[in-house]
Design a protein with these regions (language model features):
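Bacterial N-terminal signal peptides that target proteins for export
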Residues: 2-11
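A short hydrophobic/aromatic micro-motif that marks alpha-helical segments and, especially, helix-coil
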Residues: 23, 92-93, 180-181, 222, ...
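A broad helix-preferring feature
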Residues: 2, 21, 268-270, 280, ...
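Beta-barrel outer-membrane channel/assembly domains of diderm bacteria
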Residues: 14, 21-121, 159-166, 170, ...
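Active-site-proximal loop/turn and secondary-structure-junction residues that shape catalytic pockets
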Residues: 88, 127, 176-178, 217-219, ...
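Surface-exposed coil loops of outer-membrane beta-barrel proteins
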Residues: 24, 42, 47-63, 92-108, ...
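Detector for outer-membrane/organellar transmembrane beta-barrel domains
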Residues: 193, 200-300, 306
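Transmembrane beta-barrel outer-membrane domains
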Residues: 30, 59-66, 100-106, 150-154, ...
């Protein structure tokens, strides 16, 4: 009888130790795990009754639309951190316009190695360093997108290194041609892209001022075209309530066979004023120079566009409501009126609901 009690006690102790070990292992694993995400939906109406939107993600007219559900997981172990960022919906599909199948879901997938407290090496696929605006609606002050964002790079897949020098940083890397998760068999003739792009950034992040000079250069070999992009983003916080942002980008396309170069550029200004902790007012003004007609914006000749967006963000906990009015005018008739006739200006109203966790 004593032996039976001893056996039971031993089994109980072993079970308790095993359970404690499992809990310790689980706690150790979950300690390095972070989970975040967002979801957004919107309604947009063009005042002409026609779709006159020429930028990303908000084209449908007079329609309730699903934006994107996003789920981001990061896990850290020592000097290594892995990030998996998954998106489902219209934004994710347009973001991954070159991809198909399961790659449509992958916004970001990369591994960071903190070689020192100043040097970080990253391998995988990540959203671009170029530009002021971001893919996720919850991370932008204004829901609709600028031309600079819509026709600039979305993401890069490759290898990069970032080095911190006080408040400055220097980043350099090599990547597949813009917006390609893989360069294998992706050329127009079904062959492989043979060259990699060079990507880089020099940045400063101060208490009130932040500024980043960004770029990408590369060849689309075996295609004869090449691209060079220089981009500047900056933000200045005048007070705790008032912020100014600027984005200037210039893209030059050249060809190894044909002579001459083509260019497009954009200058964007952003103003944000926090009325209260729950309400912010936003304004964006953009001047797009598409005189070489690189972007083919609804006309057989080149044009310029001046776009103005007035927006508000109303917050309640994790929820955001974003109403906006957008007005555009062009040097050419790139929009249409209610009868389908070409015209040189457009306007629309949009309201979006965003939840971030």
């Amino acid at each position: 009888m004593k032996n039976l009690k001893t056996i039971k006690k031993t089994l109980f102790i072993c079970s308790a130790l095993s359970y404690g070990l499992v809990l310790a292992q689980e706690k150790s694993w979950t300690d390095g795990l972070k989970l975040s995400g967002s979801a957004d939906v919107f309604y947009k109406a063009d005042f002409s009754g026609k779709n006159n939107t020429l930028t990303s993600f908000t084209a449908p007219n007079n329609s309730f639309e699903l934006g994107m559900f996003s789920l981001k997981l990061t896990h850290n172990t020592g000097k290594f951190t892995t990030t998996a960022d998954i998106g489902i919906g219209n934004r994710a599909e347009q973001f991954n316009y070159n991809e198909s199948d399961s790659k449509l879901l992958i916004k970001q997938l990369f591994i960071d190695y903190a070689a020192t407290d100043k040097l970080t090496i990253t391998a995988g696929s990540w959203t671009t360093h170029v530009g002021y605006e971001l893919l996720d609606a919850a991370d932008n002050d204004i829901y609709s997108m600028s031309y600079a964002f819509s026709y600039g790079p979305f993401f890069h897949t490759g290898l990069k290194a970032n080095y911190l020098i006080g408040k400055f940083n220097v980043m350099a890397g090599v990547a597949n041609p813009t917006d390609l998760k893989s360069s294998f068999g992706k050329a127009p003739d079904g062959s492989d892209y043979k060259n990699k792009f060079f990507i880089w950034q020099v940045g400063y992040a101060g208490d009130k001022l932040s500024a980043y000079l960004n770029g990408q250069q590369g060849s689309y070999n075996p295609v004869s075209s090449n691209i060079s992009q220089f981009d500047l983003t900056a933000a200045y916080k005048f007070t705790d309530k008032f912020k100014l942002g600027v984005n200037a980008t210039n893209v030059t396309l050249s060809d190894d066979v044909a002579s001459g170069k083509q260019n497009w550029s954009s200058l964007v200004g952003y103003l944000k004023y926090d009325v209260t902790d729950a309400v912010a007012l936003n304004y964006r003004a953009e001047y797009l120079d598409n005189k070489d007609n690189v972007l083919s914006l609804g006309a057989p000749v080149g044009n310029t566009v001046f776009a103005n967006t007035v927006s508000a963000t109303i917050k309640s906990g994790a929820f955001q409501l974003k109403p906006e009015l957008r007005f555009e005018s062009s040097s050419e008739d790139i929009y249409v009126d209610k009868d389908g006739n070409a015209k040189s200006n457009s306007a629309n109203f949009l309201i979006a609901a965003v939840y971030k966790f």
